[in-house]
Amino acid sequence: MLRPSLASLSLSVSDTSTKKPIVIHHHNNLTMGGTEKMCQIFLKHFIKDNTFDHYVAYKADGDNTREPYFKEIVGPEKMICYESPAKLLNTIHGLKPFILHRYSAGIPEYPFVSEIKQHTKHFISTSVFGNQDDTIDISKVIYVSKHVQHMAGKTGIPEKGIYYPDHSVVRNPIEAPYSTENLREELGIPDDAFVFGRIGRDDASIYENINIRAYAEVERDDVFLVLVAPSRECRSDVGRFGIKNAKYIERTTDEVRLSKFFNTIDVQAHARKDGECNSGAHYEGFAHRVPLISHYGTTFQGHLETTGGGGFVVLSGDVEEYTRIMKAFIDKEVDYEALSEAAYQQYQKVTDVKMSAAQLNIYKSLL
């Protein structure tokens, strides 16, 4: 893969006549994860604004599946793929960015170090998990939900005069739907069948089977379960619990195909062991008017906040309650239209336009 050299990158910046302030968006890798997708959507909107020049920095080693998408948005000349901290430092020295924005768990980690700060006006941190980095001066901290901000202890107590003006919430921007079509014909699912769906990455450390166990209790000829990117453990559980109407969609980055998945299902049957901070997949379902069933996680409960009236969240391990809700959907004992509309209203709060403007305004506040 050809990448611009650090020397040519620095030269192109010094030769430019626009002299717009530079914002570098840093990820450890450009994976399929929600944090990287969030930044990818943001950048589509940021480049339409003429205030800043936007670059993307990331490590050469590791999973960089989204690299082509970022390259298409900002251009190959603004992709900083580095093999070592020294090489990134050299590039930062040449670019002298106005903002270096780190998207991470929020813990103290590279590139927020003094050597980088000497050549950078402002550090901004998106602390996905609410961790605090007090090792260096950070101008603004962004959280993906109020839940995470609360975990960080930075929500403030206005009635006591306690405020944290440099700590803000900007949720995952949702760009959807991409299609009005579905995958029922392709998957062999009748139009009148009731379909539950689950989407998530293949990661044994966060796998939870409450949804699989509950579905096994309600499955019948006209009820199906569609699983996107199921893990080996998930496939094993499908067989172990005797599920016959499971349909698989392999891992994909195709937004149109993912949109068709959401149009295929009636309810998103979510499960993740550690819970969610602010699930983009939930909001994508809401954008397609798909209600949600989920459960309390071991660590994060941000999905209670983001679900609102668009679904149900059961206690951790409560397969019986999860099953009861699934059955109520199938038997039309819940007001599906009301839940569907409530889900859509949740999505309306986090459209790509609204969230991109919110984050861009944080950058502009530092000018």
Language-model segment annotations:
Residues 74-78, 235-256:
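Nucleotide-activated donor-binding/catalytic signature segment of Leloir-type glycosyltransferases, i.e.
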Residues 24-26, 190-206, 212-215, 226:
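Conserved donor-binding/catalytic core segment of Leloir-type glycosyltransferases
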